Regions:
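Jelly-roll (double-stranded beta-helix
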Residues: 1-224
Length: 224
């Protein structure tokens, strides 16, 4: 739709250099492992990671077949906006509050600068244009390598969050879907229905009659 795009990719080869100039991306790693090389540095990723890539971040995926893990399998969510923790998890200063199902220590940023060298480096760039969907692509050639960076400053950077670090919110009776929310974008949310103790009151209804999502579409992605 006009707010979010979803895709699924399987690969065992290094991707081209890429930049999404339209919105943030959240990529879930179903299986496999990789290093996401970015202008901010190297970002190791593994099974169960949500990989958060801010808009316009130049990057490429380098799959790593560790211990026969096989090809990299990913589920990608592309926004037309930023993707961030829900506002109710945050203080007015941007800190994750105690009732949030995860904390800052669960978020992992790039490990070190890449200091890559090269010239005439092609970067595939997705941006707005006059195509049927309003989205087009261009190839931008950088005269010097975009990863030839010794450091950076600020608080906007790619990071990973592993779903195993998500602490589920439970209750004696059925909890509504927002209890399972991990991130949000403009007009959509990302939830994780992780293993948990559910509806443990003796008279609880596991799937109550009033649980009907009539105002939004749902896409369920099942993983082991």
């Amino acid at each position: 739709n006009g707010d979010v795009r979803i895709s699924y990719a399987v690969s065992d080869t290094t991707s081209p250099y890429y930049r999404n100039a339209i919105g943030d991306e959240c990529v879930y790693v179903e299986s496999g492992s990789a290093v996401v090389e970015t202008v901010f540095g190297a970002l190791p990723v593994r099974q169960g990671d949500f990989v958060m890539l801010p808009r316009t971040t130049i990057h490429r995926w380098v799959p790593q077949d560790v211990d026969g893990s096989g090809p990299l399998r990913t589920y990608a969510i592309e926004a037309n906006s930023h993707i961030a923790p829900p506002k109710r998890y945050l203080s007015r200063f941007g800190q994750l509050l105690e009732h949030s199902p995860y904390c800052e220590r669960d978020l992992h940023g790039p490990t070190k600068p890449l200091l890559a060298e090269g010239s005439d480096v092609e970067v595939l760039t997705k941006h707005r244009g006059n195509g049927p969907s309003g989205i087009v692509g261009s190839t931008v050639v950088h005269t010097t390598h975009p990863f030839d960076v010794v450091g950076w400053d600020g608080c906007l950077y790619p990071y990973t969050f592993n779903v195993s670090d998500f602490e589920p919110i439970t209750g004696r009776v059925h909890q509504p879907p927002p209890a399972h929310q991990v991130f949000e974008g403009n007009n959509f949310v990302i939830c994780a229905f992780v293993p948990r103790k559910v509806d443990y009151h003796p008279l609880a209804i596991p799937v109550p009659y009033y649980h009907s999502n009539v105002d939004s579409d749902e896409v369920m992605f099942y993983v082991d």
